[in-house]
Amino acid sequence: MARNVYGLDLGTYDIKIFDKKKDRIWHAKNVIAMKDKKYIFSVGDDAYEMYEKAPGNIQIIFPMKNGVIARFDDMQYLLGDLLKEERSFIRGAEYVIAVPTDVTEVEKKAFYDLVLHSEAKAKSVRIVERGLADGLGLGIDVPEEPGAFIANLGGGTTELSVLSYGGIVMNRLLKIGGEQLD
């Protein structure tokens, strides 16, 4: 039986999950609707439908800010709910998380802990720098590529990376993304 490996990209506005076994990408909005500041009312795409339309007693919360986890408990609830919803996720699978390169070790550990202690009951969790993950996702032979420039324009950040022979030569995480350009 082939092992189950999932790649996660937790962005400011979107969550992307790659299922290696099924060779498919699953998308969901990275948002929570909270009622009266204490009850989770809705998550994911359903919560996003309420964005800028919700009444005053419903708050729309984005658990990520500038590419990192800003509200750990909310992010953990959201990820757990999404994994329960998507029945194809197998407990005991391996997870690879793409994280921005220019973040602190504490911020990277938050991504690691988020998945390790989630509903996924992960067998293993690995962190990979987003620039390398982007290169692989684009079909670039990263270990053999003499040079590639990659720009990842996200909702809250833009990450610029120069890759060469399997490594990142230069990387910048800019705290400007689609929300500022809209």
Residue ranges and their predicted role:
Residues 1-28, 33-41, 45-151, 163-182:
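Nucleotide/phosphate-binding catalytic cleft detector across ATP-hydrolyzing
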Residues 159-161:
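A structural feature that tracks compact, well-ordered secondary-structure segments
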